[in-house]
Each structure stands twice: as structure tokens, then as C-alpha cells.
């Protein structure tokens, strides 16, 4: 029996559970894209699937709305896939294991994908209904939002006529997003030179950090949580100061827009220095625990000996350059907004640290609501990377979404909210990328607001979606569509 079958609105939770049963990690969205196409064809709706996998579905206006401006319902089909160490799952072949606990839906030790599966579920439920009044609809579901909004960047809009865009990719009920930061993905490629291990009595050691809370690198960067990659870079530098080490393996984080929760390094050291290494880690553990006692109270550094023999190591120059890059590259909040003191204006997150055969890649999500500051951060990364012998690349650049002084859609949504709930919604500009900016750049007269039901800890295995908030947001959405004549 379906886990969510008894929940209202039934159509929304039915489609959400179906979506959760289809693998749809970023860069692995063909199955979910084809599912959306089949859905539309079964209902004789116009559908276009582009080469990227983006899907556009159109539904005619209901009676009385034939002359109303066209409305776009927009979200993304991909999700961030994260799990705890003890969870066995193949995100490429298996669906999620949903859990319903009272008012909360979550997945068993994995991310839930409410970001942004709930938007897709809303859209499908509206497309499938025959009793919901609405203007002509253009449902636009994009791919690869979570890895740089690549689908929205690549989509063509010549066949779209929407005047209003409802973006269902926000996680705070009662908040209407009316602007966002721009951003890019920046990568520092540090070369590796391998050599035979020439230490007299080498001992292999593994250093790791875990117990961090992580989170979304835009929405939660303001919480100043520890970054596993930066923390281990700092730890390696402390070890390097105490002993002669050679790096063997380095790994931490796979998503530039998720603050990394854990990371590991493998290195070799002379046997006589292993106790010195352990003492250096123990000393730094006390320091880091004190620094992050509020934001990451369970941060833990671990050092242990490896059992396998090591034949090749990074030479001193390439290993030292990698450690220096991890220590020196900027990370976290760089500037708060002068106009809105509670808003992060500029930040970056070292979310990806992965080793290829001949290089280590350090991937950043760079964000700013001021384009020149975003470009300056990119320049800093490039300059330092190249100074240390690496190469720099960037991709996924997207524009900021600037606040509009006049917005009919915003006015309607505020009025509906006040009538339904007796209070004013919070109008906000956020330090995170949403696809609105890209669509508004392509469709100059588009009027857009982003909103959604209450979710917590997105992009982590603790992600939770609140049932009653979904119900209220559904009611809110239907009333908005009813008013947009």
C-alpha cells in the first residue's frame, strides 16, 4: 500500500509518491522526463521535450478564463541525492523509501526530494484535474537545477506566452520570494604528480571529519556551519607542520550547492611520526569543537592507521599545493547586504572535492546579488588557483533576479494570502539561485513570484516536508489561479 495514499489532497500526494519512486538525481533525469511526457500524451495535452530533457506541457484555459493572461507553473525535476553512511541504496536504480510520521514526510536516511518534487506533483495534479478553474497553463519542468540550473539556462522559450510565472521552488511557507542572487560554478583543477613512496618506514593513515550538519549552500550559509573540506584542509596543514606527510587520496563532497558534511584524506607518514600526527589531530579537535560548539556541536576529527600498503603517493610539490589551496581559498559568507542587513549579499561554498587520476577538483558555488562581487570572487579563486599551479574553469552562470517595484502577480498573491490566513506574507529576496532569474532574462515582461510548502534541511538526509503546509499551499495555489483573470 502506498505510504501517502490517505493524505489530502490525494492527487498531489499520489503524484509525489510516484515521483519519489522514479530515480531522478541531477544528471540522471531521463526516466522522470519520459514519465512526464507519457503523462501528457495520455491526457492529449501539448508536450515538448527538448534535447536536455526539459518538459513543457500546455493545458487550455477553463471556461471563463479564455481571455486571461497565460500562467506558467514552473519547477525542476531533479533532486540532490544524499544519504547516511549506513543506508544502502543505489540512487540510479532505486526509488526512495518514504516514511510518514504524523504531520511529517521524510525518506529513510536519504534526502526526500521535496525540493522540487512537490512542485512537479502540484503541476501534475492541476493538469489532471477537471474541476479547477484556471487560465491557460504552461507547465515548465526543468532538468539539472541543482547542479547549476542547466535546464533553465538551456531551454528555449519561443513557444511560451506566459505573462505570470508561479515558481514552486521555495521551502518556507508564508514567504514570497521576489528576488534572488546570481551565481556560478567555479572549479579549481590542481594537478597531481605521482611518485613511488620513498619513506623509510611508511605508515598509511586515514583522516576524516564527520558529525557536521551541512545544508544548502545558499539558504544556510548564513548559519556559518563548518565546511568538511575546509576543516580537513586546516587539519592537514596542522599535521604537515608537525610531520612530513605524502597525500594518497582526497575526497569530500559531491555537490557544489551542499555544504559538505564529511570528508576524508589518506596519507603516509614515517612510522616514528604517527604519534605526533595523532596528537596534532587531537589538539585541533579541541579547537574546532570549541569554535563550532553552536553550529556543529558533533563535529569529529578521526585519525586511524590504514591496513593496505601504499605504492604511490603524490609528490611533495603537488601535495603541498593542494593543502595550501584548501587552506587559502575563500569560503563562506563574504559580505552582508547594507540595504537588508539580515541578507547575505556574497558568499561561496567549497562543496566538491574529488580526485581524478591526474588532478584534484575543488568545486565552488559562488553567489552574489551584486554581479561585480560575484566576478571578484571568481577572480580570487582563479588567481590563487593559477598561482599554486592549477587551472580554473567556470560554468552555470546565472543572472540575479532583481526586485520589481510593480508586480500585479505579487499584489494578487499578497491579497489572497491575507484573505485566506489573516496575516501578511513575508516578501523576501534570498541568497540562493532560483530559476526565475533565467526565465525573466529570456522573457522580459514575465512577472514572477516563488513560493512553496514548508520544508526543513533540504539537501540532507534530515529533509522533511510538512503535510499540513502542503494542504495550505495547495489551497493557496488554486485561489491564485482563480484570481488571475
Spans of features found by a protein language model:
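Midchain, well-structured core segments that form catalytic/ion-binding scaffolds
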Residues: 96, 101-106, 110, 146-147, ...
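Zn-dependent metallopeptidase/amidohydrolase metal-coordination segment
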Residues: 9-12, 338-341, 345-360, 365, ...
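Active-site-adjacent substrate-binding region
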Residues: 220, 227-229, 234-250, 378, ...
Amino acid at each position: 500500500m502506498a505510504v501517502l495514499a490517505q493524505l489530502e489532497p490525494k492527487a498531489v500526494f499520489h503524484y509525489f509518491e510516484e515521483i519519489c519512486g522514479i530515480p531522478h538525481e541531477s544528471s540522471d533525469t531521463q526516466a522522470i522526463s519520459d514519465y512526464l511526457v507519457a503523462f501528457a500524451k495520455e491526457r492529449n495535452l501539448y508536450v515538448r521535450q527538448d534535447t536536455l530533457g526539459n518538459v513543457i506541457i500546455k493545458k487550455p484555459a477553463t471556461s471563463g478564463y479564455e481571455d486571461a493572461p497565460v500562467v506558467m507553473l514552473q519547477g525542476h525535476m531533479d533532486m540532490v541525492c544524499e544519504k547516511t553512511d549506513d543506508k544502502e541504496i543505489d540512487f540510479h536504480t532505486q526509488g526512495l523509501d518514504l516514511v510518514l510520521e504524523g504531520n511529517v514526510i521524510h525518506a529513510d536516511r536519504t534526502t526526500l526530494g521535496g525540493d522540487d518534487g512537490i512542485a512537479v506533483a502540484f503541476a501534475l495534479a492541476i493538469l489532471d484535474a477537471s474541476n479547477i478553474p484556471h487560465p491557460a497553463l504552461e507547465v515548465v519542468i526543468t532538468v539539472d537545477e541543482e547542479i547549476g540550473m542547466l535546464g533553465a539556462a538551456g531551454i528555449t522559450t519561443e513557444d511560451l506566452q506566459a505573462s505570470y510565472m508561479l515558481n514552486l521552488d521555495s521551502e518556507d511557507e508564508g514567504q514570497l520570494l521576489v528576488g534572488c542572487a546570481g551565481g556560478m560554478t567555479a572549479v579549481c583543477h590542481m594537478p597531481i604528480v605521482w611518485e613511488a613512496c620513498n619513506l623509510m618506514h611508511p605508515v598509511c593513515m586515514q583522516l576524516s571529519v564527520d558529525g557536521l550538519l551541512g545544508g544548502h549552500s545558499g539558504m544556510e550559509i548564513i548559519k556559518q556551519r563548518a565546511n568538511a573540506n575546509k576543516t580537513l584542509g586546516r587539519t592537514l596543514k596542522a599535521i604537515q607542520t608537525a610531520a612530513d606527510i605524502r597525500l594518497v587520496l582526497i575526497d569530500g563532497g559531491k555537490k557544489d550547492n551542499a555544504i559538505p558534511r564529511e570528508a576524508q584524506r589518506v596519507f603516509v607518514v614515517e612510522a616514528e611520526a604517527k604519534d605526533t600526527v595523532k596528537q596534532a589531530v587531537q589538539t585541533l579537535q579541541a579547537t574546532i569543537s570549541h569554535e563550532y560548539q553552536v553550529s556543529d556541536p558533533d563535529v569529529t576529527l578521526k585519525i586511524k592507521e590504514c591496513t593496505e600498503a601504499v605504492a604511490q603517493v603524490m609528490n611533495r610539490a603537488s601535495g603541498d599545493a593542494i593543502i595550501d589551496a584548501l587552506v587559502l581559498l575563500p569560503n563562506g559568507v563574504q559580505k552582508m547586504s547594507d540595504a537588508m542587513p539580515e541578507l547575505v549579499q556574497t558568499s561561496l561554498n567549497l562543496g566538491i572535492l574529488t580526485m581524478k587520476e591526474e588532478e584534484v577538483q575543488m568545486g565552488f558555488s559562488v553567489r552574489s546579488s551584486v554581479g561585480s562581487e560575484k566576478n571578484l570572487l571568481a577572480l580570487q579563486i582563479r588567481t590563487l588557483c593559477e598561482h599554486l599551479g592549477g587551472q580554473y574553469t567556470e560554468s552555470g552562470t546565472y543572472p540575479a533576479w532583481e526586485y520589481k517595484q510593480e508586480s500585479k502577480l505579487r499584489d494578487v498573491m499578497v491579497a489572497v494570502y491575507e484573505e485566506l490566513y489573516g496575516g501578511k506574507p513575508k516578501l523576501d529576496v534570498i541568497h540562493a539561485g532560483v530559476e526565475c532569474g533565467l526565465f525573466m532574462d529570456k522573457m522580459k515582461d514575465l512577472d514572477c513570484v516563488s513560493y512553496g510548502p514548508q520544508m526543513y534541511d533540504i539537501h540532507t538526509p534530515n529533509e522533511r516536508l510538512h503535510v499540513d503546509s502542503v494542504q495550505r499551499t495547495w489551497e493557496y495555489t488554486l485561489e491564485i489561479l482563480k484570481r488571475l483573470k
